Structure formats: structure tokens, C-alpha cells
Design a protein with these regions (language model features):
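Ligand/cofactor pocket segment of small-molecule handling proteins
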Residues: 172-178, 199-201
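Glycine- and acidic-residue-rich phosphate-binding/metal-coordinating active-site segment common to enzymes
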Residues: 168
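Internal active-site segments that recognize and position negatively charged phosphoryl groups
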Residues: 141-143
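A conserved active-site cap/scaffold subdomain adjacent to cofactor or substrate pockets
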Residues: 192-209
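Metallocofactor- and cofactor-centric catalytic cores in central/energy metabolism, strongly enriched
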Residues: 1-137, 151, 155, 159, ...
Length: 209
């Protein structure tokens, strides 16, 4: 398998859909409602919409979009803290672009930037570390976001900053663990989920249990 081309093969996709329909017919379950499967990973949600997978599935399957975006489930108070950090003296606040428009109780980071805060969009914590190197007289605060899968890159960047004696680099860590999040959903008595489409990279971080 060449990894990319096979996953974008429409004929292969149709054959997989046909197999799913066969499996559904073999399931011994009530027909009162569709089989509800929740995808957890935001990458899965993006792929489902991009390739129209939801529309290809039979009516007996309903995809439930789960908490796949850590930015979307970020508490309002954390956004307020980020805005407060960004407004600090001599601070460069570095964040992923998708966090810019998330609204706090009063302001978003984008609004803070418009009001004069030095908020900059980066693609990785390494970019934020580069800002710290380039601005030794400023405090560079990286808005650490994501599930367990993003933590190693942030941790490695912190170690790199220590190795280089870059003492003006800081991390405002707001990482979320996925297992308690999913457990809270499954513990709800009215969730009606029949299955979960788990992200492989999270499984690598958390283990099979």
C-alpha cells in the first residue's frame, strides 16, 4: 500500500461501503434507531466532511461528532487567562491560528491583538522558540493546546530551550487528556453511543487499555 493513493481510491471506498452494509445486515440489533458511532479525532471529522463519507453511509449508521478539537472544548476561563497573559508587559503571545477567534468571557485573542497585544500565530512550539531566540528582551509565551499527542513536541521544545539556555521562553499549558473526556461521555446515562472510532495516534500515546 502506498498509503495516500489507496485511501483516495473511490472504487475501493465504494467496496468498503458495501462491506459495511453487509455487516449491518448481519448485526442482531433493534431497528428503532440507527447505529451511532462517534469519531473522536478532529482529523477523522475533517476527512468525513472532505470526502463526503457521511452522505455515502446507509441511513442505519449515524456518525456522531465527538470532542475531537481541544480548542473547541477549551474552558472559557482558560481563554481569559490567555488574553490576560497576552496583555502582559513585554510579552509576545504565540498561539495556533485556530485559537485566535475563540471567545472568552469578554475578549478573544484576536480582539486582544487588535487592542495592541503582541499575539502571533505559529504552526508549532518550535516556531515560538524561534521567536524567543529572536527577541531575547521579550517574554515569549506559547499557548500549549491539544490532547496527549501534542505534548511530546511541546516537551521537546522546552528541553531544547533549556539546552540552549533560552530563558525567555514560557509555555501556558492547557493540554487535555482524551481518556477522561471520553469516559465522561460514556458515563452519561443517555449517550446512546454504540461504538467509538478511536484515533490511532492517541492509542499510541495511551496504550491499548
Amino acid at each position: 500500500m502506498k498509503y495516500v493513493s489507496e485511501f483516495r481510491d473511490p472504487e475501493l471506498g465504494q467496496r468498503l461501503i458495501a462491506k459495511i452494509e453487509q455487516q449491518l445486515q448481519a448485526l442482531s440489533r433493534s431497528a428503532e434507531r440507527p447505529l451511532k458511532i462517534m469519531e473522536v479525532c478532529g482529523g477523522h471529522t475533517h476527512a468525513i466532511f472532505k470526502f463526503g463519507i457521511e452522505g455515502m453511509l446507509p441511513d442505519s449508521i449515524e456518525l456522531v461528532h465527538g470532542p475531537g478539537c481541544p480548542v473547541c472544548v477549551l474552558p472559557v476561563g482558560r481563554v481569559d487567562d490567555a488574553v490576560a497573559n497576552a496583555g502582559g508587559p513585554r510579552v509576545i503571545f504565540a498561539t495556533f491560528g485556530d485559537a485566535m477567534r475563540v471567545q472568552g468571557a469578554k475578549h478573544s485573542l484576536l480582539q486582544a491583538k487588535a487592542s495592541g497585544a503582541d499575539v502571533r500565530t505559529v504552526y508549532s512550539p518550535v516556531d515560538a522558540l524561534a521567536l524567543a531566540r529572536e527577541n531575547p528582551d521579550r517574554k515569549v509565551v506559547f499557548f500549549g493546546l491539544g490532547f496527549e499527542t501534542t505534548v511530546p513536541a511541546v516537551a521537546l521544545t522546552v528541553l531544547q530551550a533549556e539546552a540552549e539556555s533560552v530563558d525567555n521562553f514560557f509555555v501556558f499549558s492547557n493540554h487535555i487528556t482524551i481518556v477522561p473526556t471520553i469516559k465522561a461521555i460514556l458515563d452519561a446515562p443517555d449517550h446512546e453511543l454504540d461504538g467509538i472510532m478511536g484515533p490511532g495516534h492517541e492509542t499510541m500515546m495511551n496504550g491499548v487499555e
